[in-house]
Swiss-Prot record:
This is Thymidylate kinase. SUPFAM superfamilies: P-loop containing nucleoside triphosphate hydrolases. It comes from Listeria monocytogenes serovar 1/2a (strain ATCC BAA-679 / EGD-e). Belongs to the thymidylate kinase family. It catalyses: dTMP + ATP = dTDP + ADP. Keywords: ATP-binding, Kinase, Nucleotide biosynthesis, Nucleotide-binding, Transferase. GO terms for biological process: dTDP biosynthetic process; dTTP biosynthetic process; dUDP biosynthetic process. HAMAP family: Thymidylate_kinase (MF_00165). The keyword Glycoprotein does not apply.
Length: 208
């Protein structure tokens, strides 16, 4: 069985974390040799950067600082976690990757998406996902889910208003148009179990 790099993307409240947990279980049951990781984070240094970027109290952070910090964390994650796993024949399941930077920082912060893309391509070099699952849900539905989930850890980006989250969604649409061959859009208004089964079936096809 070949090793592939899989990423989960979607706006806040799309159910990505829940689906990631279920997918981890189902992929293990299917006998797939893989690791599960996340961004920002995924390595000791990158997790420290995550705490800075998402920490409540860092609202004054400049948008370009945000881009550069996340790109730096991503570089370390690629070098320390993702590439070694792929080289060892293990697939990688990652909660967010470069596309999040394009949507959240590029579009959400009204930055030049091409510049954000180039910064990230410099960081990751040739380590692009083989398959990206975009969990598609309206911004208002996602934010309502966040508000209803009292046990969810709230980060700095969750506190942004609906306009920001709508920009993020529009940004994702641009990213999907940039890389249509690796994206699969998944209806995230369905149950986590239904979403997981849809994604797992496609992963098994990709690995065949």
């Amino acid at each position: 069985m070949k090793a592939i790099f899989i990423t989960l993307e979607g706006p806040d409240g799309s159910g990505k974390t829940t689906v990631g947990t279920l997918l981890n279980q189902k992929m293990t049951e299917a006998g797939i040799d893989f690791i599960k990781t996340r961004e920002p984070g995924g390595s000791p240094i990158s997790e420290k950067v995550r705490n800075i970027v998402l920490g409540i109290g860092n609202e004054e952070m400049d948008p370009k600082t945000e881009v550069l910090l996340i790109a730096g964390a991503r570089r370390q994650h690629v070098v320390e976690t993702i590439r070694p796993a792929l080289a060892a024949g293990k697939s990688v399941l990652c909660d967010r990757f470069m596309d999040s930077s394009l949507a959240y920082q590029g579009a959400g912060r009204d930055m030049n998406m091409e510049q954000v893309l180039q910064v990230n391509l410099y960081a990751i070099e040739d380590t692009l996902p083989d398959r990206t699952y975009y969990l598609d849900v309206p911004a208002e539905v996602g934010l309502a889910r966040i508000a209803a989930n009292k046990g969810r850890e709230v980060n700095r980006l969750d506190k942004e208003d609906i306009t920001y989250h709508e920009k993020v969604q529009a940004g994702y649409e641009k990213v999907i148009n940039m890389f249509p061959e690796r994206f699969m859009r998944v209806d995230a208004t369905k149950t986590p179990e239904e979403i997981t089964e849809t994604i797992l079936a496609d992963i098994l096809r990709q690995l065949a």
